[in-house]
Amino acid sequence: MEYRFNTPLNGNIAMTYHYHEDAALRRDKSLYKFVWVQSGTLDIEVDHVVMHLEKDEIISLTPLHHVEVKRVEGEYLTFLFNSNFYCIYGHDKEVSCNGFLFHGSSHIMRLQLSAAQSEQLKSIIDIFAGEFGIKDNLQEEMLRIILKRFIITYTRIAREKLDVGQDKEKSFDIIRRYYAVSYTHL
């Protein structure tokens, strides 16, 4: 399964099970990424640190991360998009490109999904794949909405897994703002 959509303003979104084989996607340093192991295992190097991911583990990565797939034993999904497609300033700070999933921690957001959580995200992926078959002037906005739904659902799962309440929210917000300022001035 391979889906790509490009907007007239250089917005890009893609979903693939073959990221490691796609030189164009690997070369594109503007992409935010969700890497989700659907079966088997995946060894992926992020910023020169090898991570061993197993079934239903998911990570979120920014364009600043250097990513190299080392070993694939099974199937994994990579969901990618750039800031021209989604990251406009109007998005809520928690589900934006400067939000919780990408800049909410000093570590890479890595979660083990339960079967129910995996099904939640899979249903969104199925809707996304179905939308690629509909070629009309509403497709771009629908893909953006589906991406936002994926991000919101994943954010809720992460907040629950990490037990983020009001007391921890300030710490995450400070980290998020630090990354936003750093990214702006680099």
Stretches found by the model and what they are:
Residues 132-148, 168-169:
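All-alpha amphipathic helical-bundle segments outside canonical DNA-binding/catalytic cores
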Residues 2-10, 70-130, 154-160:
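A hydrophobic/aromatic-rich effector-binding and dimerization subdomain
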Residues 170-178:
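N-terminal positioning helix adjacent to the helix-turn-helix/winged-helix DNA-binding module
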Residues 161-165:
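Hydrophobic/aromatic-rich alpha-helical bundle segments in the mid-to-C-terminal region
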Residues 184-185:
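Conserved small/polar residues in nucleotide/adenosyl-binding loops
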Residues 54-66:
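Conserved metal-binding segment of the jelly-roll/cupin
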